[in-house]
Amino acid sequence: MIELNKIYNEDCLEGMKRIPDGSVDCIVCDLPYEVLNKNNANVQWDRIIPFEPLWGQYERVTKDNAAIILFAQGMFTAKMMLSNPKLWRYNLIWDKVAKTGFLNSKRMPLRQHEDICVFYKQLPTYNPQMVKCEPDKRNHSKGDGKHSQKNSCYGTFVEVPTIISDEKYPTSIISVSKEHTIGHFFHPTQKPVALIQYLIRTYSNEGDTILDNCMGSGSTAIAAIREKRNFIGFELSKEYYDKACNRIKMELAQPTLF
């Protein structure tokens, strides 16, 4: 049986078989894209996981209202969307802020984003992360109940300024800088903890269980801990499994304010 808040150093397709049916509230995973140098022995882990058995496990272990959130880019985005068109709903854009691809800058635009594919069976938990903004002031029509030639629909009225809100709903673009700081970069395809925290806050509630079947260096586990969620993780590489476990130990050892 699978324990919560633990990473397993094994093939995720085998490990997920031990997760009870309908027990996962949300999946956040950065699957291998198979875009790194295929001749580099250090990135042999970057191989696409067969979609059919992967989706078989995803659909079995998740609750009906669980969001399945998968990172992708380029042709892998198309493959990912077509791997389960029945459950695919929409894509988010991760704006990395920093640009890459300068060697090809005279041939194509600089790259600054990756895709995030969102799948689900039924409408999932959705907690929109409101964005602070300047209060939106609009003129509000206040009628007196009398009809006039000024406006045949609303009658005589005066306009009064009304403050609508100092928050706005989030868009499909999420801007979070990549983690480049020495001591915070552990994996070549590492995603920012802040980005995963944003996704976890949006698509789950405190106490929920988050699955990441390609845990890498443990960013999803760190994000889950900070957002008071449980996690289940799998990582095939012993090197990155060890790094993830060490990061989790360091995170749990940090003093909290509460």
Model-derived features: positions:
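Core catalytic lobe of class I
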Residues: M1-G233, S237-D242
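Short, conserved SAM-binding/catalytic segment
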Residues: M1-I2, C245-F258
